[in-house]
């Protein structure tokens, strides 16, 4: 190798090293700010709104503890923000609760079912792990028990669970609660440090995304 080639190769290595360190610094900066950039971004439901998507599990105590913060935020959010939830069965033991969430969604009874299900598990300490017990619980809430049981085991619920898992994998969801802002930014307790930190990240990223609509 002559001197000219050596210098050219050295320059390329230096440039590549610089880019590598720049990438590391960018990731570190994102983590310090409480979020991670999703690259590539994940598709959202509507292009004319900023989507905020929470991933959760009914059996998760951290999700239950986060509910007052995210509910307060949802009550006060601007009209241009679309808030949605997904309950993918990231662990096989989560499946009955995922089925319950999507059954309630498909039957149009989420408002009747969502908060009582959380309270039943975490406040009343009820054992709501088996489909039959969950369906019976739904019946106590004035929901058609038999229909709820059948819907939990339906093709429609299977499809929604599969979609939720695909979305979670694309969004690099490893635990809950996790929040994805407009398919581009991932945050959660481990990244933002606290419930208030998660809400701060949501508000900052929403404002930035709204400016791009």
Model-derived features: where do they sit?
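Extracytoplasmic thiol/disulfide redox context detector
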Residues: 2-92, 207-213
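Solvent-exposed loop/turn segments at secondary-structure junctions
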Residues: 59-62, 89-93, 119-123, 157, ...
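C-terminal cap of thioredoxin/glutaredoxin-like
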Residues: 5, 140-213
């Amino acid at each position: 190798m002559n001197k000219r080639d050596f210098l050219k190769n050295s320059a390329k290595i230096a440039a590549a090293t610089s880019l590598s360190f720049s990438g590391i610094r960018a990731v570190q900066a994102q983590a310090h700010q409480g979020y991670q950039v999703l690259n590539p971004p994940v598709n959202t439901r509507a292009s004319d709104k900023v989507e905020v998507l929470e991933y959760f599990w009914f059996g998760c105590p951290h999700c239950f503890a986060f509910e007052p913060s995210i509910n307060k935020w949802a009550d006060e959010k601007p009209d241009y923000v679309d808030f949605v939830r997904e309950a993918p069965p990231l662990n096989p033991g989560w499946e009955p609760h995922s089925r319950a969430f999507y059954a309630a969604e498909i039957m149009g009874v989420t408002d009747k079912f969502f908060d009582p299900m959380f309270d039943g598990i975490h406040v009343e300490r009820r054992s709501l792990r088996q489909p039959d017990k969950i369906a019976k619980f739904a019946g106590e809430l004035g929901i058609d028990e038999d229909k709820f049981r059948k819907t939990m085991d339906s093709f429609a619920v299977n499809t929604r669970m599969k979609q939720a898992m695909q979305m979670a994998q694309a969004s690099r969801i490893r635990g809950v609660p996790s929040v994805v802002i407009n398919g581009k930014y991932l945050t959660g307790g481990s990244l933002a440090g606290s419930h208030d930190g998660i809400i701060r990240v949501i508000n900052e990223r929403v404002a930035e995304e709204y400016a791009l609509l």
